[in-house]
């Protein structure tokens, strides 16, 4: 929902065990709204910790249309208005009565994916979010805000060409009875009222589920929990998982390789990053429940490198 992805160079630092990043992530120029140069981590005091950060703010519609065209160029059929009603073994039933069969079925439909609902009973933490697109000039620094304005989650301002993507995500159990709408309205109003679009959704924040494969069924992306909880990164992480899944499926069909190789290769490439991110989010969720004045003290030049380790999924260090 935030439309932000790290540059390829940032991805190589964030996910050092992922091979051929440049081959995987080939975002076309027309789908890039802005290139960012900094990330500001902002406590309640408003005094940010500033870090160099190369990011790409996407035109999400253009980006997703490009992905569709790329898939079609490789032989995929793209169906619109095709709602999945049921998945049973090798059969997929649509709401309009059509039925498809396949030796392998991949669920890539987000955290409410119908394949996951049918065959997986593992629950995940989902953070409700609300965001807007707003016209204006907001600089070129990405902002992540922490504290009582977004209990258990964070708020963001991601600048775009001629505007920004601004939003809030919270954990309801820490909201003390206040609604997401109240938190979002209060935060968004800080930046003005030139709203051109408003949206809402939820973000899976438990990290990856225990298994991605059941018989001939695979999950990828948000459906498999492929979001880094400590920073919300999901687009590029899902593309990493999607490539591994695709390569495994080809190997399975051609050489009868076990589909569970998908899970093993994911752990080789992303296991340590995801573990660190889960731990950082768990610790961070506790820290962010502290009073704002303590958070303000915690965000200082001395702690600056350690805060960055939390966000970038490295093993967190804690100083007492």
Residue ranges of each PLM-predicted region?
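Conserved FAD-binding catalytic core of PHBH/FMO-like flavoproteins
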Residues: 110-180, 185, 209
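A conserved beta-strand/loop element that lines the FAD pocket in flavoprotein oxidoreductases
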Residues: 72-84
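C-terminal helical "tail/cap" subdomain of flavin- and related membrane-associated enzymes
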Residues: 247-320
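Helix-loop-beta segment of a Rossmann-like dinucleotide-binding subdomain
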Residues: 42-59, 91, 160-172
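Short hydrophobic core segments
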Residues: 84, 92, 99-111, 217
